[in-house]
Each structure stands twice: as structure tokens, then as C-alpha cells.
Amino acid sequence: MRPTGRSAQQVRPLKLTRHYTKHAEGSVLVEFGDTKVLCNATVEEGVPRFLKGQGQGWVTAEYGMLPRATHSRNAREAAKGKQGGRTLEIQRLIARSLRAAIDLKVLGEYTITLDCDVLQADGGTRTASITGACVALADALNQMVANGKLKKNPMKGMVAAVSVGIVNGEALCDLEYVEDSAAETDMNVVMTEDGRMIEVQGTAEGEPFSHEELLSLLALARGGIETIVQAQKAALID
């Protein structure tokens, strides 16, 4: 029995609140159970130096956790003077995932930055960030079209992510913290809305996993992501 009584295939209650802050071109509060992440999209003219003159845009991301997002206070990374390796890895993952959602040539020479700030962490913060940031990105692009900055929307489709893992020998979808901390295998999967894979991060924390278990986890992730994409699309209609 899982802590909240979910089935092995079931994702946590998912809520996507759009227009959460008023200044950002796209702003979404994403909630997976007790994990809550604020995702803001900012549109700026111009691109990084390595892309200048190529007629294409760029999507990047930053990720951080509030000091009391977890059970005990963690000092702000700004106070330490540098970002940690985990933070850098996660924000690069978010950016790579979202670049797969749009046609950068159609975007033109604009940069969109997704700021993902974890308000409360209970497992799956990176996957929640990708899911919420994709909706914020969609809102920002829709606004650019409405404002005449873009003639065509460069969005190719939704991108979503979920964690899966093996806990006490059972494959589970969308791990909360107590499950994640006890997992023998932990995996983060990012997919397009039509089920193509963008990224798979899998680690055997205890026992190595078999090829069959890998396929089982990927199938579990795909089912969870299908549910998440439906929620993303429903949120964008509201």
C-alpha cells in the first residue's frame, strides 16, 4: 500500500494554476500532491552570443528551492556564492526538455527563460518543474502571437515528465519523498505528448535492474505522462 493509497500506476493529484503571478509572460503554479513549484516564463529580445545572426531563438531555465521547501532549512545558494551540482544538472535538464517542445527557428531571435522555484518539496521536483514550465512556456508563446511578436506559434506540442521507480520490488509511478528515498531503482522520464522520449535518467540505488524492469518502468512512465499531458491541455483551455 502506497502512503496515500494510490495504485502503482497512479500519479498524485495534479493541479496547474495559470497566471499565478502578474508580471511574467507565462506563470504557472504546478502541484503534484505536496510538491509545489512556481514556474515563470520571461521573454526577452536577443539570443546568446553563439546564436547571434542565425535567426533562431533559445530556451533556457533556472531552478532553485526555497530554504524551507524541505523538512529542514537549506541555505540559499546565493548565500554560498555558487550553485550546486544538483541545481545545475536539473536546470539543464529542464531547458533541454523544453527546447524539444518548440521550433527554435520559428521563435526567431528571442530568448525565453523559465524560472522554476520549488516552494515545497515532496519528491519529483524536477519532473514537476518540466511539466509546469511547459504550460508557462505555452502561455508565453500564445502571448507573443497575440501581441504580434510572432506570426506563427513555434510550439510543436506538450512535453511532460514523471518519476518512476522500484520500491520493495514493485514498480511505482510518480514517487513521493518517502518512496523515492527507499527506492531500489529511481528513474526520471521526459516525453513528448506523442510518447517519444526526450530524456531518461535511471539509477540503481540498491539492486541493479534488469532489461525487463527497464521496459516496465518506461511503460509505466508513458502511462503517467499521458495523464499529465491531458491535465496540461485541460489547463490551457481554461
Swiss-Prot record:
Residues holding phosphate: 86, 124-126
Q: Which domain of life is it from?
A: Bacteria
Q: Which reaction does it catalyse?
A: tRNA(n+1) + phosphate = tRNA(n) + a ribonucleoside 5'-diphosphate
Q: What is its EC number?
A: 2.7.7.56
- Which key words tag this protein in UniProt? Nucleotidyltransferase, RNA-binding, rRNA processing, Transferase, tRNA processing, tRNA-binding
User: What protein name is recorded for this chain?
Assistant: Ribonuclease PH
Species per Swiss-Prot/TrEMBL record:
Pectobacterium carotovorum subsp. carotovorum (strain PC1)
Gene symbol here is rph
Q: What does this protein do?
A: Phosphorolytic 3'-5' exoribonuclease that plays an important role in tRNA 3'-end maturation. Removes nucleotide residues following the 3'-CCA terminus of tRNAs; can also add nucleotides to the ends of RNA molecules by using nucleoside diphosphates as substrates, but this may not be physiologically important. Probably plays a role in initiation of 16S rRNA degradation (leading to ribosome degradation) during starvation.
The intrachain disulfides are: none
Q: Which InterPro entries match?
A: ExoRNase_PH_dom1, ExoRNase_PH_dom2, ExoRNase_PH_dom2_sf, PNPase/RNase_PH_dom_sf, Ribosomal_Su5_D2-typ_SF, RNase_PH, RNase_PH_bac-type, RNase_PH_CS
Chain coiled-coil ranges: none
Any one Pfam family here would be: RNase_PH
NCBIfam families xrefs: RNasePH
